[in-house]
Structure formats: structure tokens, C-alpha cells
């Protein structure tokens, strides 16, 4: 048996079922092209019979994608198969995926037929799909709850009818790994023509076991895993592609299996899907979460600096990230602070380590996470633990034209003790406020991240805005709190402005320090 596991991505079909709004054809094509770069073997991109929009997107993707096999879903109905075949006909290579329910509860309650009638429908559908392509996949919906005798009969009949891939879904995420592995093993033991098809699995995450069940299945002979980027999908989601890919890569020595996935594209693809689908990835998500390669514990950080594999079983570079993050918090040791200062270009003779670490701990207790620019300021500025509020927002007034979408903002800001008033327009109230603040401060920064949240519950909650901005090729993080979202946004920007002002002072100090070195000074 081959040790190659086929990766069947269904982000654009099953994954899209989790979205509040459908993706546009252009957005689906963007994701499809990213999946092609990622190296998925098969991508299921829609359900053509369901709507003209889905038909168009399947056809557009089928026409464009060359290096992955494009697949479309159909029920075990001729009209569904016709629509799938027509949409896919423009592709160089394609697959028709047809399915029918096989569990007793589905057969009796949903289909209202006998199992024998359902089996006949499945056989007819597979034979009909084979008129259009040799690559036909058949799925036994709710296989995880199907009586094993019935499942074996269905699989044997579908293979005999011409299916070259047989998919065994745990549609409602009900099984546990030992149980699901037994199902796969039983199929291999009892279905006489099983060697004529690839056995696939499609596991849902209702009990959080989709990845574990999928790995167990390939250990028992399955050779295709159906999955989605970031694990998105109906209800609790699907098996996560990035987790499967990195499990098989990281544990190749034990599992003896491999995929064709280009792992360095994982991070980029995850971000794209998250943004286009408007589904943020939870910070502690395996592989692609913001904290996946972040270390805050002082003991862990010290170990990481000595040898990365003390606390990392894979590298961030392996999924396309530049490096891991050592969050500087009150739990960070002196070794971490010294390491960060060295990375920023400072030798231990440039600052007083004892004084710096003492002030660092004070600031970390006060604000939680300390950033590089904080550390520089602590090392070289007076009143080290206090932020230099060169800019202070005094007043913000916003007027918005709901019909045109143009807003006007007027701000009064104290700039180094001098009061300045400026007005500006923008595409919405937040944009207008930002433009007015930029005018008043005469300081331009690029916002690369804007996150809106809340502090508190109900009517008493405060709007919290977190922004990340780039200034002189360095990232700065600002936070604003207010009952009004626009005001919170303005306060976050002013926070960043103060940080950049302080960074400029640090840069001037560094420059003078460098001149003293060159002149032989202390």
C-alpha cells in the first residue's frame, strides 16, 4: 500500500457552509489559487446544482486551476450530476463526488426509503457519473452511525459500479478514534474489492476529534483525508488541513506517511482564508494560531534561547513564518531581555542591565506585554516606567453623511503643551478622525491591523480598539478605550503617536551614543 496520503480540500464547499455570507466568485478563485500553491491534490469547490452562483464559481475555478484536481459535489440524482459535469467540463482533469445517506436514522427519517432502495440509488448515481469521468467519488453520508453490515454492502456495491474513491464520513462527529479506526479496518477485512478504490475519510469536529479520527483512519489503511483550511465548516467545523499536514510531516518517522503539501504556504493560506471568510483564527489554534510559536514562560524562553527544540516540535519557518515570538512579560527572565537587546543591536556595555531589568518588571506588571520599543525607552530614557504623552486628545467631534458615506472629524489635541485644532474628511468617521489627528500631529503612520472588541458586558461595556501601525519600518501597538467606538479608535491612534514620538527620542539618543563611541567617548 502506498504511503502517500491524498489531501482533499473542501474549504470552498463544506467550509463555506459555515459562513454568514457567501464568497464572491473572485474571492473563491483567490482561495482556489492559494490551495493550488499549497499543493492540495483535490479541491472540492462547490455544489453546482444549488445555485447559478455556485455553478459559475465551480466553472471559473475549473477553467483556471491546472495543478490540482477540481471536484464538485452532487446528490445521487441525475440532475445534480449533470450540473456538476457541465460546470467541470472546462477543466483539464476533474472529479464528480456523489453521495447518499446510509445510516438507519437518515435512511428512515430523511430519505424515507429502505436500505436496499438507497443502495440502488447509489449504484445508479455512480454509474451515471462514470459517463462523464473515470474519477468518481462516492460518499456514505453518516457512515459513522451506519450499521457495519450495511456499510460494507454499500462500499462493495459502489466500487463495483465504478467509484474509484470511497469516502467514509463521520458526518456528525460522533465517533471516537478507536471506534472509527475499527470501522476502517473492518471495511478492509470484509469488502472483497476494496483494493480497487482509495478509501477516504471526512470527519467533523463536534466532539473535537476530527483530526484524531482522520489520523487513526490512515493508520488503518485510508489514503485520502478530506479537510479544510483552519478547520472551518458546518457546526463545530471540519478536520483541519494544516494540522493533518504537520502531524504527518512532524511524525513521519512514526506514522510512515507523507503528503504533497507545500508546508511553507500554510501560514499565508490560513491568513487568506481567515480574512476572506471573516473568520478569525483563535490565538491558541494549533499550527496557525497567533500563539502557536509564542513563548511567555521564563523557563520556556530560556530553554528556547539555548535550543529551539526544547519547546518546539516544529519550526515557524516550516509553515512560512519568519520566526517564533518570545513575549516579554513579567515571567521573562534576564536572559530573554539581554537576548532582545542584542537582537536590536545593543551590547551589554550600552546600558545597565540591573536597572533595565528592574524597570522592565515594573512596566510588565503595569501593562502586561512589553514590546521592543518599550525596552529601548526603559534602557535609555529618564522616567523610564512612564510613557511620554507628547500628544493628548482633548476633544473629538464627528459628523457623518449616511447617504454619501463621507464623514468630517474635528479634533483638538495638545501637542507638546500647545493646543492644535484640525478638521478632515474621510471614508467614514474613523477614517476622518485618523486623518484629522494626522494633520494635527504632522505625523504619518500606516495602520496594518485594526481590531474592535469590548471591555465589560451589556450597556456598560466599553469599546476597545487595538491597532498595529508601522512607523519607520517598526511596528507599534496602540489601545483605546471609550464608550464610543470612534473615540476609542482615536485614542488608540494617539497612543501609537506617543509611542512613535518616544521612539524618535530613543533614536536620537542612540545616534548621539554612536557618535560618542566614534569620538572615543564613554
Swiss-Prot record:
Recorded family membership: Belongs to the alpha-IPM synthase/homocitrate synthase family. LeuA type 1 subfamily.
Q: Which residues are Mn(2+)-binding?
A: 14, 202, 204, 238
Q: Which GO terms describe its molecular function?
A: 2-isopropylmalate synthase activity; acetyl-CoA C-acetyltransferase activity; manganese ion binding
User: For the region Regulatory domain, what residue ranges are annotated?
Assistant: 392-522
Spell out the reaction equation it catalyses. Answer: 3-methyl-2-oxobutanoate + acetyl-CoA + H2O = (2S)-2-isopropylmalate + CoA + H(+)
- Subunit structure, interactors included: Homodimer.
Offer a single GO CC term for the protein: cytosol
- Indicate whether Phosphoprotein appears among the record's keywords: no
Q: Which UniProt keywords apply?
A: Amino-acid biosynthesis, Branched-chain amino acid biosynthesis, Cytoplasm, Leucine biosynthesis, Manganese, Metal-binding, Transferase
Q: Which NCBIfam families match?
A: leuA_bact, PRK00915.1-1, PRK00915.1-3
GO biological process terms on file? L-leucine biosynthetic process
Provide the function of this protein.
Catalyzes the condensation of the acetyl group of acetyl-CoA with 3-methyl-2-oxobutanoate (2-ketoisovalerate) to form 3-carboxy-3-hydroxy-4-methylpentanoate (2-isopropylmalate).
Q: What is this protein called?
A: 2-isopropylmalate synthase
A Pfam family this chain is assigned to: HCS_D2
Q: Where in the cell is it found?
A: Cytoplasm
Which Enzyme Commission number(s) are on file for it? 2.3.3.13
**Pathway terms, separated by semicolons:** Amino-acid biosynthesis; L-leucine biosynthesis; L-leucine from 3-methyl-2-oxobutanoate: step 1/4
**Matching SUPFAM superfamilies:** 2-isopropylmalate synthase LeuA, allosteric (dimerisation) domain (SSF110921), Aldolase (SSF51569)
**Cofactor(s) named in the record:** Mn(2+)
**PROSITE patterns in the cross-refs:** AIPM_HOMOCIT_SYNTH_1 (PS00815), AIPM_HOMOCIT_SYNTH_2 (PS00816), PYR_CT (PS50991)
Amino acid at each position: 500500500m502506498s504511503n502517500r496520503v491524498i489531501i482533499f480540500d473542501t474549504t470552498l464547499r463544506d467550509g463555506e457552509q459555515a459562513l454568514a455570507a457567501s464568497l464572491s466568485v473572485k474571492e473563491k478563485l483567490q482561495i482556489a489559487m492559494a490551495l493550488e500553491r499549497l499543493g492540495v491534490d483535490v479541491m472540492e469547490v462547490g455544489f453546482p446544482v444549488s445555485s447559478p452562483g455556485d455553478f459559475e464559481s465551480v466553472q471559473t475555478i475549473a477553467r483556471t486551476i491546472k495543478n490540482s484536481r477540481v471536484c464538485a459535489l452532487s446528490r445521487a440524482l441525475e440532475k445534480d450530476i449533470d450540473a456538476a459535469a457541465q460546470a467541470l467540463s472546462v477543466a483539464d482533469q476533474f472529479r464528480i463526488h456523489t453521495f447518499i445517506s446510509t445510516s438507519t436514522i437518515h435512511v428512515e427519517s430523511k430519505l424515507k426509503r429502505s436500505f436496499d432502495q438507497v443502495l440502488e440509488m447509489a449504484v445508479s448515481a455512480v454509474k451515471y457519473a462514470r459517463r462523464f469521468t473515470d474519477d468518481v467519488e462516492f460518499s456514505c453520508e453518516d457512515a459513522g452511525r451506519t450499521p457495519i453490515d450495511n456499510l460494507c454492502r454499500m462500499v462493495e456495491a459502489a466500487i463495483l459500479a465504478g467509484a474509484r474513491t470511497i469516502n467514509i464520513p463521520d458526518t456528525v462527529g460522533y465517533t471516537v478514534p478507536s471506534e472509527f479506526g475499527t470501522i476502517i479496518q473492518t471495511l478492509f477485512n470484509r469488502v472483497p474489492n476494496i483494493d480497487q478504490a482509495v478509501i477516504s475519510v471526512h470527519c467533523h469536529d463536534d466532539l473535537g476529534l476530527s483530526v484524531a479520527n482522520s489520523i487513526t483512519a490512515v493508520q488503518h489503511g485510508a489514503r485520502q483525508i478530506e479537510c479544510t483550511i483552519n478547520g472551518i465548516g458546518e457546526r463545530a467545523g471540519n478536520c483541519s488541513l494544516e494540522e493533518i499536514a504537520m502531524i504527518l510531516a512532524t511524525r513521519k518517522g512514526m506514522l510512515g506517511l507523507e503528503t504533497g503539501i507545500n508546508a511553507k504556504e500554510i501560514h499565508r493560506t490560513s491568513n487568506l482564508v481567515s480574512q476572506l471568510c471573516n473568520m478569525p483564527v483563535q490565538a491558541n489554534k494549533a499550527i496557525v494560531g497567533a500563539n502557536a510559536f509564542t513563548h511567555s514562560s521564563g523557563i520556556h524562553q530560556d530553554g528556547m534561547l539555548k535550543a529551539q527544540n526544547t519547546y518546539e516540535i516544529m519550526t515557524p519557518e516550516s509553515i512560512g513564518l519568519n520566526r517564533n515570538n518570545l513575549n516579554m512579560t513579567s515571567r521573562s527572565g534576564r536572559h530573554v531581555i539581554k537576548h532582545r537587546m542584542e537582537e536590536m543591536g545593543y551590547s551589554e556595555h550600552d546600558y545597565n542591565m540591573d536597572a533595565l531589568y528592574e524597570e522592565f518588571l515594573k512596566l510588565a506588571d503595569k501593562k502586561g506585554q512589553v514590546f521592543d520599543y518599550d525596552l529601548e525607552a526603559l534602557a535609555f530614557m529618564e522616567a523610564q516606567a512612564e510613557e511620554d504623552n507628547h500628544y493628548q486628545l482633548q476633544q473629538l467631534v464627528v459628523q457623518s453623511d449616511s447617504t454619501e458615506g463621507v464623514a468630517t472629524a474635528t479634533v483638538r489635541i495638545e501637542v507638546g503643551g500647545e493646543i492644535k485644532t484640525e478638521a478632515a474628511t474621510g471614508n467614514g468617521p474613523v477614517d476622518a478622525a485618523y486623518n484629522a489627528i494626522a494633520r494635527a500631529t504632522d505625523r504619518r503612520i500606516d495602520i496594518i491591523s485594526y481590531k474592535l472588541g469590548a471591555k465589560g458586558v451589556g450597556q456598560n461595556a466599553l469599546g476597545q480598539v487595538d491597532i498595529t501601525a508601522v512607523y519607520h519600518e517598526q511596528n507599534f501597538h496602540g489601545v483605546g478605550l471609550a464608550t464610543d467606538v470612534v473615540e476609542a479608535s482615536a485614542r488608540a491612534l494617539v497612543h501609537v503617536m506617543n509611542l512613535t514620538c518616544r521612539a524618535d527620542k530613543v533614536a536620537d539618543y542612540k545616534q548621539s551614543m554612536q557618535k560618542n563611541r566614534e569620538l572615543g567617548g564613554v
